[in-house]
Amino acid sequence: MSNLSLLDLGFFIAETAASPKHVGGLLIFKRPPKAPAAFVKNLYRAYLAATDVKPPFNRIIQFSMNALPHWQATDAIDMNQHVFYHVLPKGQADRKSVYDFVSKLHTPMLDRSRPLWEVHVIDGLPEGLFAIYHKMHHAYADGVTMSRWTAEGFSTSPTDMELTPVWTLKHGGYGTRRAKANNELLQMTWKEVTGNTRRFLGIGRLAAMLFLESIKLTKNAIALPFVSSAK
């Protein structure tokens, strides 16, 4: 069990269907020379078989009226709920069609009943291209961190054929450096709050965050797209 930082808790409190708090990244690749027709589908199958899921990708958010919000690790991960395969229709495989398709994938909130991430493998692009779209909750990582984690899974040589999906890598320091100071403050504050006061605090915090969004002070604050060259 791992407690949330104040910042991460804020993302959950302010999250709504109209203002989801996840980040996404689109990667477009060229197939290797002489790759078989099923290369992209085989990549998807290899992703499904990569079931050694490391933190934070094995964590589910848990809320309770008598305990701190916290992450709960789970071994019951159905990869079919996290890894998806798509083929773009013929005639709709240009770059704009890819971007439109990914925007539809990006719109819905992630399901809080399971780990908060998805990977979509997209086939059918022209000129031997294919795409991979990553989606994960901002409480897991911000956009820059997601880009860095993804880059850590890339091979450094065309002869290196080992597949290392982002969810199978150990991400050093997760839940320690990022949250340690904030967690201590959260625990001290939470102990001072009991009964109805705790409920009012939660409602007040929620109202404040939603009010800030309603007057456009925080709306889309984490939804700005960017191009990363993370190494």
What positions do the PLM features span?
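Soluble acyl-CoA-dependent acyltransferase catalytic core bearing the H(X)4D motif
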Residues: 1-7, 26-37, 45-55, 59-231
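M16 family metallopeptidases and their MPP-like homologs
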Residues: 7-15, 19-29
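Active-site regions of oxyanion-processing enzymes, predominantly non-cytosolic
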Residues: 40
